[in-house]
Design a protein with these regions (language model features):
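N-terminal export/targeting and maturation segments
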Residues: 2-6, 25-83
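Short, small/polar residue-rich loop motifs at catalytic or cofactor-binding pockets
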Residues: 10, 116-119
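Short, structured surface segments that line ligand/substrate-binding pockets
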Residues: 12-13, 110
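Hydrophobic membrane-insertion alpha-helices, especially the h-region
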Residues: 14-27
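Second-shell loop/turn segments in exported
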Residues: 36-41, 109-112, 120-121, 135-137
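A short, structured loop/turn motif at beta-sheet edges
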Residues: 55, 97, 125-129
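Mature extracytoplasmic domains of secretory-pathway proteins
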Residues: 58-116
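A short, surface-exposed interaction/processing loop segment used at functional sites
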Residues: 118-155
Length: 155
């Protein structure tokens, strides 16, 4: 039979305890350093939606041109997948709401640079949270883009 005998030293014990504490702290802190999803953007009321658009630089008519309830498909394919990619660019969680009923609010934009009319802002809302949005032009050669106000080109 073998007997092992060892003696713990206070310095070594303290160093081991400190290393363990540091390792535990890193395990708890590092996950919090990962990129977090953006905080939900409130959009449950007209005032919330108008404040959001105004904060981005848009001037819109206060009353929506259209309010429409939509059931998003379970799997976002084709045009819906393209739209989800546009929302991901804006850090909006549109794709997370696949298969759910959402409400789209459409507002007339009155200050799109160089285009005095025919521009609209769409906001998709689920519950009280903004989940997506875009700016569209209804002109013959129209466009669809993010909600970000376009940069002005200086001469």
């Amino acid at each position: 039979m073998f007997v092992y005998h060892f003696r713990l030293r206070k310095g070594l014990t303290a160093a081991a305890a400190a290393a363990f504490t540091l390792l535990l702290a890193l395990l708890l802190v590092l996950p919090g350093c990962q990129k977090q999803d953006a905080a939900p953007i409130p959009a449950g009321t007209d005032a919330d939606r108008l404040a959001y658009l105004t904060g981005l630089g848009w001037t819109v008519e206060e009353t929506p041109v259209e309010t429409l309830d939509l059931l998003l498909p379970e799997k976002l394919k084709d045009d819906w997948a393209n739209y989800a990619a546009l929302q991901k660019e804006q850090n909006l969680p549109f794709a997370d709401f696949a298969g759910q009923t959402v409400r789209r609010y459409t507002y007339t934009v009155t200050n799109y640079p160089g285009i005095p009319e025919g521009v609209q802002a769409n906001l998709f809302v689920c519950g009280d949270q903004l989940i997506g949005g875009d700016i569209i032009s209804l002109a013959e050669n129209g466009f669809q883009t993010t909600l970000n106000f376009p940069e002005q080109k200086t001469a």
